Amino acid sequence: MKIIISPAKKMNMDGDFLSPRNIPVYLEKAKKLQRHLQSLPYEELRKLLCCNDEIAGLNYERYQTMDLSGYTSPAILAYDGIQYKYMAPQVFEDDYFDYIEKHLRILSGFYGILKPFDGVVPYRLEMQAKLKTDFCRNLYDYWQDDIYRELTQEDTTILNLASAEYSKTIEKYLTAGINYVKCVFGELRDGRVIEKGVYVKMARGEMVRFMAEKAIKDLEQIKEFNRLGFRYREQLSDNNTFVFVKAMAEK
């Protein structure tokens, strides 16, 4: 089984207590993107990243000085969003790290796909960024089926804990032989499941931690997830969508 998650916009390099074990599989493609981003004028980069001047300035400097083969941090410790805070890899036990290195993959607009212990540097480039160059129409076009092929080399089961922005990179390439399951985390209101961004991110992080703690290898075991008030709802789910409803919000 492979579990896919999204990256986070915010990054840090404070994971010095663990070292990278690998280089990203598509490092050369990341270098090509870096060269292009490095060539952009500041204002053009700011528009591409859709951010304020402070963040644009930080990332303009990053791309100008970036050394993708130099000092790096393990990807799982480099991202600093809500999902990663609730996953809390900083306090993982060794066997949890072994589990996620085998089963977890982080999708990235810049690196394509990452193992947890791939060495990365801070960057900002969302998959949906309107990057149009002489070699691609956008990042979905740039990555084509690269991410999907890497993801399905060894496994035919994919658990989707990523946002639509990132899961879109593989969904168009799915074949009949792939068991693809999406997790939905929401509140039940008037018979409909309503997802709230913050709660979804929290639950995705908790789900990864839950799976690592239990060393889950079978999809059926995922249904036992019961953290943050979420419970699996059989009647709302099907073979390709596992729905978890926040119990306290049911009406």
Swiss-Prot record:
Coiled-coil blocks: none
One of the GO biological process terms: response to hydroperoxide
A GO CC term assigned to this protein in UniProt: cytosol
Lineage top rank: taxon: Bacteria
Entry similarity comment: Belongs to the UPF0246 family.
The protein, known as: UPF0246 protein DSY0297
Organism lineage string: Bacteria, Bacillati, Bacillota, Clostridia, Eubacteriales
